[in-house]
């Protein structure tokens, strides 16, 4: 028999002792949490503030649920709450909730909101037009989304929004759904990811319920389908979505689609689907500029009731310049760090909080062409000569060096390297690599040459 507090203490102990997350992260996000109660198959856990609750749900939920299952041999849902709300969930004196055996199989009703996305009509309450920060990179996408929401199936149908991860595509889709619901409370809205659409379709085939599946998705007013690029390669699902699209479009129902790339760049997407995606309006969202990033941080701080100086916001905005989710996450981390170390939020605290999560600039990926150009410049020969069939000593030796570097500094296969050097056989590449490797053991001049070339390639 274990109660919620004991279970949660065990969970934290395992995570800390086995270093399943860095110590700094554990101290910042997990150490201050506490198990409050067991409600059926739901474990209620408190955290000191709402932004910590949000961070735990986004970053740690999977790890925590796996650890809970490992300890209890039960699949328990974790529901995070603010510490100030803990009294609402704490069991009354003598309540069995406080000492439920974790192997309890009897289901008990738990009045908690569902977190599952994809249910027809279910939308995220935070994703509305009023909370969307408009900037140069998303202004047109926002205007198009608002136009669609104001006049479904009359403005742009379909509306296709594309852009990188965390830039606001999903926010706009949910905002459209909320706006339509506000104007027409009886409207049937479906928000679904392409992955969930695929899974439901597969399940309907397995259970002989394809008719029910089709009725569900073809009798709605607005279809919001996220990450359509994941339909690539799924021929049967594409076939089903093609007919769903046609049915809705013919009935003058609104379709909104999001993707990480435009239709023409989605591989193995059927041409008939690609052409339909291009029937309406295609708009993109690009990473926010500095002013927009600061505005996003300011709006989040206001929503959370946080007093953050412009100096700190500027610092954070300068560190994260591509992804809105990471930007908001950075603010959350700074606030949590300041709270836990008991210091005011200033640029120094922000720098300390973010020092180990700043994106490290990836080294440029070296390709064979880079090596050919650098070697050619070093030996004063043209790349075309390096790749020619000529076997003069002035060409053969630099060519062998270039092949050696291609083998050492790229992930290309031997046949690929040979192909890039004038269609030579892979055995030629092996010979070149062995020859240069042998010379490097004792030839100081060769060692210096290779070092110089590697340095040039790295720069």
From Swiss-Prot:
Entry annotated with the keyword Cytoplasm: yes
Region (Domain IV, binds dsDNA): 339-459
Gene3D superfamilies membership: 1.10.1750.10, 1.10.8.60, 3.30.300.180, P-loop containing nucleotide triphosphate hydrolases
Molecular function as annotated in GO: ATP binding; ATP hydrolysis activity; DNA replication origin binding; lipid binding
SMART domains reported in the protein's UniProt record: AAA (SM00382), Bac_DnaA_C (SM00760)
Family membership: Belongs to the DnaA family.
Subunit comment: Oligomerizes as a right-handed, spiral filament on DNA at oriC.
Function noted in UniProt: Plays an essential role in the initiation and regulation of chromosomal replication. ATP-DnaA binds to the origin of replication (oriC) to initiate formation of the DNA replication initiation complex once per cell cycle. Binds the DnaA box (a 9 base pair repeat at the origin) and separates the double-stranded (ds)DNA. Forms a right-handed helical filament on oriC DNA; dsDNA binds to the exterior of the filament while single-stranded (ss)DNA is stabiized in the filament's interior.
Swiss-Prot/TrEMBL domain comment: Domain I is involved in oligomerization and binding regulators, domain II is flexibile and of varying length in different bacteria, domain III forms the AAA+ region, while domain IV binds dsDNA.
Protein name: Chromosomal replication initiator protein DnaA
Protein species of origin: Exiguobacterium sp. (strain ATCC BAA-1283 / AT1b)
Gene responsible for this protein: dnaA
